[in-house]
Amino acid sequence: MENQARLIRLPEVMKKTGFGKAWIYRLISQNRLPQPVKIGIRATAFVESEIDEWIQLIIENSRKHVA
């Protein structure tokens, strides 16, 4: 069975990252956060696995610089 990507909306990304909406949009504009996908005329969502991988990468990089 194929692993299907789960799409999450901005409020869930905010909960997962702890960042506010403006900061998330800033990171997106700087290509520092995975880009959202268009799911409608005025709606976007994020691929949950991409956000989770990004969070893990941030954690790993943070711990590398502490040591």
Spell out what each predicted region is.
Residues 17-45:
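Major-groove DNA-recognition helix of helix-turn-helix-type DNA-binding domains
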Residues 60-67:
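C-terminal secondary-structure termini that scaffold catalytic or DNA-interacting sites
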Residues 1-23, 50-60:
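Polyanion-binding surface elements
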Residues 47-49, 65:
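Extended, folded domain segments that form the structural surfaces/walls around functional sites
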